[in-house]
Amino acid sequence: MFEYLKGTVADILIDKIIVEVNGIGYRIHSTIHSVSQIKKGDAITVYTHLVVREDELSLYGFMSIEELDMFQKLISVSKIGPKVASGILSAYTPNKLSAYILSKDISALSKAPGVGKKTAERIILELKDKVDKTNVVYDYTLFNDDHKDDDEAVQALMALGYSKLESEKAVEAVRDMSLGTEDVIKRALKWLMK
C-alpha cells in the first residue's frame, strides 16, 4: 500500500522513527542500522512495508531497498513475524545475513534476537534459493568467532543496568573492528543516551 514515505524525522527511538509527512506523524518500526543513519530534523525517504493485523496496522521502514527486500524475505519464512525480522536485521546487515544463509551458518544466525537453532535452520532452508547470490560480498572475518571485544562491551553495558537486547543493539550500531572494548563501550553509551 505504501511503497515509501518522504518526510522529516520528528523523533528517533531505539527501534522506531517518527516521520512527519504533510503534517502527519507516521510511527515507523525500523532497525538499528536504519535508525543509526539518521538524525532528528533530517529530510529522508523511508522504504516501507505495511503489516496488517486484526487489531492494528504497523509500518516497518528502512533506509535502503536492500534492507526492505530482506525484511520481506524474512517475514515470508514460516513462524517469523515482523518484530523478529526487524530484530534479525538489527543484528545483521542484509549482506551479512545473506552470507550466513548461503554458507548455512546456523550458529551465527541463532545469535540474532528471537532466533534459536530451529528458526535458523528454517531461515536457511526457506531462503537459500531466494537470496541473491550475485550481490553477496563475503567478508571472511564474519566467519570467525573473533567478536570477543563486542561480547565484553555487551557484558559491561549490562553491568551498568542496560538490558541484553539494548546492549547488543548499541554495540552493533557503533561496531568498528578497529576499536578496542573501552572505545566500543564509550560509543555505545553515547548512542544509548541520544
UniProtKB/Swiss-Prot annotation:
Residues 64-142 are annotated as: Domain II. Keywords: Cytoplasm, DNA damage, DNA recombination, DNA repair, DNA-binding. Residues 151-194 are annotated as: Domain III. Coiled coil: none annotated. SUPFAM superfamilies: DNA helicase RuvA subunit, C-terminal domain, Nucleic acid-binding proteins, RuvA domain 2-like. It is found in: Cytoplasm. It comes from the Bacteria. SMART domains: HhH1 (SM00278). Its main location: cytoplasm. Residues 1-63 are annotated as: Domain I. GO terms for molecular function: ATP binding; four-way junction DNA binding; four-way junction helicase activity. Disulfide bonds: none annotated. Residues 143-151 are annotated as: Flexible linker. InterPro entries: DNA_helicase_Holl-junc_RuvA_I, Hlx-hairpin-Hlx_DNA-bd_motif, NA-bd_OB-fold, RuvA, RuvA_2-like, RuvA_C, RuvA_C_sf. The keyword DNA repair applies. GO terms for biological process: DNA recombination; DNA repair. GO terms for cellular component: cytoplasm; Holliday junction helicase complex; Holliday junction resolvase complex. NCBIfam families: ruvA (TIGR00084). Belongs to the RuvA family. Has three domains with a flexible linker between the domains II and III and assumes an 'L' shape. Domain III is highly mobile and contacts RuvB. Homotetramer. Forms an RuvA(8)-RuvB(12)-Holliday junction (HJ) complex. HJ DNA is sandwiched between 2 RuvA tetramers; dsDNA enters through RuvA and exits via RuvB. An RuvB hexamer assembles on each DNA strand where it exits the tetramer. Each RuvB hexamer is contacted by two RuvA subunits (via domain III) on 2 adjacent RuvB subunits; this complex drives branch migration. In the full resolvosome a probable DNA-RuvA(4)-RuvB(12)-RuvC(2) complex forms which resolves the HJ. The RuvA-RuvB-RuvC complex processes Holliday junction (HJ) DNA during genetic recombination and DNA repair, while the RuvA-RuvB complex plays an important role in the rescue of blocked DNA replication forks via replication fork reversal (RFR). RuvA specifically binds to HJ cruciform DNA, conferring on it an open structure. The RuvB hexamer acts as an ATP-dependent pump, pulling dsDNA into and through the RuvAB complex. HJ branch migration allows RuvC to scan DNA until it finds its consensus sequence, where it cleaves and resolves the cruciform DNA. This is Holliday junction branch migration complex subunit RuvA. It comes from Alkaliphilus oremlandii (strain OhILAs).
